[in-house]
Design a protein with these regions (language model features):
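Extracellular glycan-recognition regions
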Residues: 21-128
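Bacterial Sec-dependent N-terminal signal peptides
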Residues: 1-22
């Protein structure tokens, strides 16, 4: 069985973020309560404390953050612009390439101790 890669915008914590690219053709996994598409940009308010981690060294698994995605097969390019109202420790927003709940890569900007950091997590059965 050929696996398809799901590429989308994974958005965590309480952020507003934007993205312009065929937004109307994408779909939600864990749809947030408040969101809109306007002027080719996605704006959302995300449930606090939501995230993507699988059997991490912290001892927990979560798969509950909003994820706006499209399904692709073969090669593709993704270009996104991410902005957010980062306020709380670990607020983050970015891009996730996902095959299923056990196999994904998420990368983005994470706010930790008053500083912005580039963050990447690779999950293959467990998150690194």
């Amino acid at each position: 069985m050929k696996k398809q890669l799901i590429a989308g915008m994974a958005l965590w914590a309480s952020l507003q973020c934007g993205m312009a690219q065929s937004l109307e053709k994408m779909q939600w996994f864990n749809e947030p309560e408040q969101w809109k598409i306007e002027n080719q940009a996605l704006t959302m308010y995300v449930t606090p404390q939501s995230d993507y981690w699988r059997i991490s060294h912290y001892g927990f698994t979560v798969d509950d953050a909003p994820f706006y995605y499209a399904t692709y097969g073969g090669e593709f390019e993704v270009k996104v612009k991410v902005t957010g109202d980062y306020k709380t420790r670990f607020d983050q927003a970015g891009l996730m390439l996902r095959i299923d709940h056990e196999n994904y890569i998420k990368t983005g900007i994470e706010f930790v101790d008053g500083k912005f950091n580039l963050s990447t997590v690779v999950t293959h059965k467990t998150s690194d």
